[in-house]
Amino acid sequence: MTVLLFGFEPFLEYKENPSQLIAEALNGSTILKEEVKGVILPVEYEKIEDLIVTKIREMKPILTLGIGVAPGRAKITPEKIAINYKYSREGDNAGKKYKGEKIDPLGQDGIFTNIPVEDLVDLLNENGIPAELSLSAGSYLCNNAMYIIIREARKYNSLGGFIHVPLHESYAARIQRPIPSMSLDTMIRGIRLSMEFILTNKKENLTFS
C-alpha cells in the first residue's frame, strides 16, 4: 500500500514553502511498511483537482495527507473540516480569483476528515511538537485541496486529511519579519509521526463505504 503526501509550491510573496520541503524530504521513505509518495501541487485552482483525483485513482493510497503552510500560525495544526467554498482576494499563482464559488457544485457544504485529529494533536504535544486543532482551513488552495482529498478518499474507503504547518525558521530569518516559525526538522518529524499514528489507528477510522 501507499501513503500519498501532497505539498504545495511557493505562492504569492512566499518564495519557499515548507510543505514542499516536507513532502520532498519524506518522499520515498517507508512508514509502517507503507511507501510514502510525495507530490507537489501547483497553487492553481484549475489544476489541483485533476491532479489530486488522478493520483488517488492511480495509487489508491491507504492514506492521503495534504500539508500546507499557514503563515502566522506558530504550531502544527491538523484540520478538522473542509468547506465547499472558494474565496481569494489575492488570486492564485495564475492570477485566478474567486468570490464565494463552490469547489464542487453537487458536493456537501462541509466534509469532516476521518483522521483522528483530536488525538493526533495530543500525540504531537506529548512528543514535544507544538500542535493545536484547527477548525478552519481557510478558503484558499489548502481548503480546496483538503475538500477534494477527503471527497476522493471516501470513494476508496481510505483515509484523507490535511495539516497546516508554520513557516520554517530559516526562511523566516532570511525575510527578516517578526512572524511565527518552526524548524523544518521539527515539522518533518511531526508529519512523519502523524502518519505513523494515523496508520496505526487506521482500522477504527475507516468508516466510509
From Swiss-Prot:
Outline what the protein does. Removes 5-oxoproline from various penultimate amino acid residues except L-proline.
| Subunit details | Homotetramer.
One cellular component (GO) term of this entry: cytosol
Record carries keyword DNA damage: no
Q: What GO molecular functions are on record for this protein?
A: pyroglutamyl-peptidase activity
Active-site residues?
Answer: E79, C142, H164
The main location class comes to cytoplasm
**Enzyme class (EC, first level):** hydrolase
Q: What is the official name of this protein in its record?
A: Pyrrolidone-carboxylate peptidase
Domain of life of the organism in this record?
Archaea
In the Enzyme Commission scheme, what number(s) does this protein have? 3.4.19.3
Where does it localize? Cytoplasm
UniProt cross-references to Pfam families, sorted A to Z: Peptidase_C15
GO biological process annotations for this chain's record? proteolysis
Q: Catalysed reaction per UniProt?
A: Release of an N-terminal pyroglutamyl group from a polypeptide, the second amino acid generally not being Pro
Which family does the similarity line name?
Belongs to the peptidase C15 family.
Origin species: Saccharolobus islandicus (strain Y.G.57.14 / Yellowstone #1) (Sulfolobus islandicus)
Record keywords = Cytoplasm, Hydrolase, Protease, Thiol protease
Query: Does this UniProt record's set of keywords contain Cytoplasm?
Result: yes
